[in-house]
């Protein structure tokens, strides 16, 4: 038995300089697991609640001392003595202790820090790398990275409404090569932006945030960079968008300030997205409609769902109840998996499993406020998710995940598998 003998929560900083929760879990054997939780900027309204102190005199109200106190008191009392290898039972203990539907009493940030740290401690105790502990012998598929090279929306201070413009190395023979391709395109894009006299400063997720004329201009910059780096757009490197459409959905219309204040119905917005998909090698669109616009989602799915991955982030918030409703109504065809949207590892794995059973893809994701914690890299391989979003090819909080995946690929050796385009298995 891997008995938990001590738990310590603490307040640390995330990549935006805001407080977040870190937790250490000590086992009877002397083994320790440590984990830190991320935080989002554009968030779904039905996400599990991240507990903040609200004291404006301290960290502008964003302190997490209440969440830390819950770890060091109530949660500690409830889980001391439990077997760290019983992850599902431990997570259920946390859920029952909180007693709310959205984890608002203890805070999803407190609960997730404990859930992750326990898994790390148990993996260390078992002598297994985390990805192997989480996934057993079946975890051997590296994820296709969706690399956010141009930022807009809530992640940048420019005129772009869409939040992320991503490159996806679908033609790479291995994860290591996919990272190399991405890095080379990133540097080619930097030179192009610089040569055009625009800023090469990066946003929260490490992508550039140039002030361009419109959204197609951003796409064309990326296509130029792919060509300049020596690759073929579409065949070797595809494109992905994260619209984060809830952020520009106002009074029942999609208001695109980056397109001159254009106001579109869901049908008109679908038509615009479809035009872009016909014109450019776009194979994935995340949050193409607002989270509450299920009729719009239905329209988008019927129009593009056979040929484009339509990812629900704010739509599904890693929640199996909402995902099941979406599956039943044939809304979207993919789910974004963010561990802090739901608050425990067990619930995260349940969402991934439900998606796969329904023929939906599952994309493991970071948040815009990250830490050096690389747990999501291990989750991506352990669950054979097939895809990961963890930012651009800069900022150590993003690179930490890529580097961990490179280590995992090396550890797997000849059995490591990079799916490439096959990761988008639900598309024609």
Curated annotation (Swiss-Prot):
GO molecular function: magnesium ion binding; phosphopyruvate hydratase activity
Cofactor(s) needed: Mg(2+)
Binding site for (2R)-2-phosphoglycerate: 163, 338, 367-368, 389
Residues annotated for Mg(2+) binding in this entry: 242, 286, 313
PROSITE patterns to which the protein is assigned, alphabetical: ENOLASE
Subcellular location: Cytoplasm; Secreted; Cell surface
Keyword field: Cytoplasm, Glycolysis, Lyase, Magnesium, Metal-binding, Secreted
Disulfide bonding pattern of the chain: none
Principal localisation: cytoplasm
Cited Gene3D superfamilies: Enolase-like C-terminal domain, Enolase-like, N-terminal domain
Domain of life: Bacteria
Annotated InterPro entries: Enolase, Enolase-like_C_sf, Enolase-like_N, Enolase_C, Enolase_CS, Enolase_N
Any one GO CC term of the record: cell surface
Catalytic reaction list: (2R)-2-phosphoglycerate = phosphoenolpyruvate + H2O
Summary of the function given for this chain in its UniProt record: Catalyzes the reversible conversion of 2-phosphoglycerate (2-PG) into phosphoenolpyruvate (PEP). It is essential for the degradation of carbohydrates via glycolysis.
Name under which the protein is recorded: Enolase
Gene it is expressed from: eno
